[in-house]
Each structure stands twice: as structure tokens, then as C-alpha cells.
């Protein structure tokens, strides 16, 4: 597992090991111990999946205020998405700043979206 920092405070790109062969691939999407070893401790309360059949579908911006705020892990199981995050945390050094990230079935990257961030994505390919 590789955890990359970004220009937004507390946002991380997570790269899990991917094991592939002629049948496809296997990867862990979440392992509590590995995440904790990387300094990421999350108490997940919900797991969601979405499918957008057409390219160009925009989902978001999603934002929850305390006490409903959630840390999220976002990934694209199929296709390619462009995910945008905006730091909405008043007092944060990166408050009001945003960045976008490509997540795809090819790069297997996951995006750690901390509480207090708005996030949304647009599908760049069909069936995302």
C-alpha cells in the first residue's frame, strides 16, 4: 500500500497492491490494519456504489455538515472519472482551494476525502 500526499491538507491518494494475471486482478480496497499503519484511522459508517451508464454524468458536489459529516474513500471500479474536492473547513490552511484527480479501473487509485470537503465527479467514459 502506498499513500500519497496532495496539495490539499489531509487529502490522500491511496494505491493498494494489485495482483493481476490472465484472469484479471485482485486487490484489497480496505484493510483496517494497513490503513492504521499508514496513519489513516476511519470508522466507516456507510458504503455506497454508483453506476453512470453515459459519459459526462456529473455527480455532486456532495457535502455534509457536522454531525453528519463523513470521511469517504472514492474509487472507480470501472471506467474513468474526474473527481474534484473543495476544502470547506473554515480555518484550514487550504480552505477554499480545490484539486481534481483522475480515478480509473486502470490506475486503481482511491481518494481519501476527509470530513469537511465537498466532492463530486464527472464520468469520462461509459459505465463508471
Predicted regions, residues:
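Short beta-strand His + acidic residue motifs that chelate non-heme Fe in jelly-roll/DSBH
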Residues: 111, 119-124
Amino acid at each position: 500500500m502506498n499513500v500519497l500526499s496532495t496539495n490539499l491538507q489531509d487529502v490522500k491518494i491511496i494505491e493498494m497492491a494489485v495482483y493481476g494475471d490472465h484472469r484479471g486482478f485482485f486487490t484489497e480496497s480496505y484493510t483496517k490494519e494497513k490503513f492504521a499503519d499508514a496513519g489513516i484511522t476511519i470508522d466507516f459508517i456507510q458504503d455506497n456504489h454508483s453506476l453512470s451508464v453515459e459519459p459526462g454524468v456529473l455527480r455532486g458536489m456532495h457535502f455534509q455538515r457536522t454531525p453528519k459529516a463523513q470521511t469517504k474513500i472514492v474509487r472507480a471500479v470501472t471506467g474513468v472519472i474526474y473527481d474534484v474536492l473543495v476544502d470547506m473547513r473554515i480555518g484550514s490552511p487550504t480552505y477554499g482551494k480545490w484539486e481534481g484527480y483522475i480515478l480509473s479501473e486502470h490506475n486503481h487509485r482511491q481518494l481519501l476525502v476527509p470530513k469537511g470537503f465537498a466532492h463530486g465527479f464527472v464520468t469520462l467514459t461509459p459505465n463508471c
